[in-house]
Regions:
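Catalytic, metal-anchored helix/loop core of enzyme active sites in primary metabolism
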Residues: 1-395
Length: 395
């Protein structure tokens, strides 16, 4: 039986946006502004950006908010929240928003592994899960996917939203393969030696997408595409070898599904995250676009290239983690988060990122995934190990 989404008394979808001040969260609020007759924001969370939280809560008259970072739970600006707004503090308070009776759909736009428990809370509370946090499935897909009813989890990543839509009305058993598209990042065509000398500013200059800092670096290393392959194998119930990566520099084809008869379904559109965000809210309907339309007369050419796994080692490491399975993707993800954070704070070089990740993976004894507690322990171990590798590299 397919999942049945609930709606508010006035027919609007009541939305919780977890991570409302990040790139995805702010674009989700744009969608809610455009479709105020169809969407009602009933819960918001931030990590520490309390001023922005208050501004959004006031604009949308939100009845409940949460601040994940306890150090900001007493920020004076929170006194300016609308009268009667409930305030929770800490990671569990964020999860409680996903369980509220006045929430129909939970957009998990929290960066990193912190989104896993919020995603779990949404699924077990019978909410539609609009999932923008790929780490939830990379780390905990073995635990989350058995909980998701058909149609309950709608991916927000542009590529996975594209694949999801290419499967609509089709028999998944007749699919031959998935073509997961990749922009190639800002360093497409560079050599490994050239990557040794790229700067933070170079890496943050993505050619086609406007994103947060962490995912922009992941896109530059191609770790983002590696994580997306692992996410796709959980979402679509296939092996990693079923999912091919192809570089599509213009980022206009968001992914493709090739079927047994040789037909290929491709999803095209503007490079604007508001489109997949809106689809996760509107499904099974389609609403007026929140973004400029694609004019094929002005598009020019579409190009396709193979991804270079020898130069972009993170893509190969993610493939290794995905094929190994178990707790290895958790280690991959945690070590990468630590290494990317170090790079963003000038604590390591660009190519140190994959070296740190590989060292942590080499040191890990893979286990079958059994619980969220186990994943928390593995995550903590990998972060500590990554910090030690970084310290040894730069001592």
């Amino acid at each position: 039986m397919s999942f049945q989404t609930t709606y508010g008394p006035d027919g609007r979808l009541r939305v919780a946006i977890l991570g409302c001040t990040g790139s995805i969260g702010t674009q989700a609020l744009d969608v809610c502004r455009q479709h105020a007759d169809r969407l009602q924001v009933t819960a918001l969370s931030v990590n520490s950006s309390t001023s922005e939280l208050v501004a959004a809560a006031r604009e949308f008259s939100v009845p409940a908010v949460a601040v994940a970072d306890v150090a900001h739970g007493d920020d004076a600006v929170l006194q300016e929240l609308p009268e009667g707004t409930e305030v929770g503090v800490g990671a569990q308070a964020v999860c409680e928003l996903a369980r509220r009776d006045d929430v129909d759909c939970v957009l998990v736009a929290i960066v990193g592994a912190a989104g896993l428990e919020a995603s779990h809370a949404a699924l077990i509370s019978n909410k539609r899960l609009a999932l923008a946090n790929k780490e939830s499935l990379v780390v905990g897909g073995d635990l989350l996917m058995p909980l998701a009813q058909p149609g309950q989890l709608i991916p927000v990543d542009s590529e996975h939203s594209a694949i999801y839509q290419c499967y609509l009305g089709e028999n998944p058993r007749e699919a031959h393969c998935i073509w997961l598209t990749c922009s190639g990042g800002p360093f497409f065509g560079r050599t490994r030696d050239e990557l040794d000398h790229v700067t933070r500013a170079d890496a943050l200059a993505h050619p086609t997408w406007a994103m947060g800092a962490k995912i922009t670096i992941d896109s530059a290393t191609l770790m983002n595409k590696g994580l997306e392959r692992i996410e796709a194998l959980h979402l679509f119930g296939c092996d990693l070898d079923f999912i091919n990566v192809v570089v599509q520099r213009q980022s206009k084809i968001h992914s493709m599904v090739e079927y047994a008869d040789g037909s290929v379904m491709a999803h095209l559109g503007a490079s604007d995250m508001r489109i997949p965000i809106q689809f996760a809210f509107s499904y099974p309907e389609r609403w007026d676009t929140p973004a400029p339309r694609l004019d094929f007369r002005e598009l020019g050419q579409l190009t396709f290239d193979a991804a270079d796994m020898d130069t972009f080692r993170c893509l190969a490491l993610a493939e290794r983690a995905g094929k190994t399975g178990g707790t290895m993707p958790c280690v991959l993800n945690a070590a990468n988060e630590v290494a990317v954070d170090a790079f963003l704070h000038d604590g390591c070089s660009f190519t140190d990122i994959d070296r740190v990740v590989e060292s942590c993976m080499d040191a890990h004894d893979t286990q079958a995934v059994t619980s969220f507690e186990q994943l928390r322990d593995i995550d903590a171990w990998a972060r500590e190990k990554a910090a030690l590798v970084l310290a040894a590299t730069h001592s």
